Amino acid sequence: LLVWSGTEFDIRDYKNYWVKKDEQSNWMDRSWYDNPYYMANEVTSSSNYDVINAFLNASYQITPWLKLALRSGADVYTQKNEWKTPVGSVSGWGKKKGYYQFKRSSGFSINNDALLMAEKQVGNFKFDGFLGGTIYYFQNDVLNAQTSGGLIIPGYYSLNASVDPAETSKSSVSYT
């Protein structure tokens, strides 16, 4: 901002950034960037992420030199992202026509390990080793939706406000 504008501009004059609510912002040069107050408050992206982790470990001494260990871990998560760009904005998405998008992801993973560990002293020689395996499972589901062609109603961020039919996609991935 300091580089692109002269000293005659007082940034405080642009704090009240609406000329016409939800349609036109107050700014000196609308050709390639927006009022910084407007960008900070109106061109938004948000992300909410929740995760729960769990872990369980058990071991059993089979003999003085042989031990079995079992481990299991799991996590479950959800994430919601939302992007909003007002009608008339040079910044963000939507090419001055407005834009709204949301994305929801959810998934979980489970990891199970089994380890058989041996440690044996025979005379002056010490032998140790282990044998183990793991089973892993992961699943992720994603729902994504966005407006197309802009927003019909300025300031109303909903797929119902899409000029053209909203674009949606759903995907699911799982593997072991």
Regions found by a protein language model. Give the residues of each.
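Outer-membrane beta-barrel strand-turn architecture
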Residues: 60-64, 120-123
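Surface-exposed loop/interface segments of Gram-negative outer-membrane beta-barrel transport/assembly proteins
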Residues: 1-51, 69-175
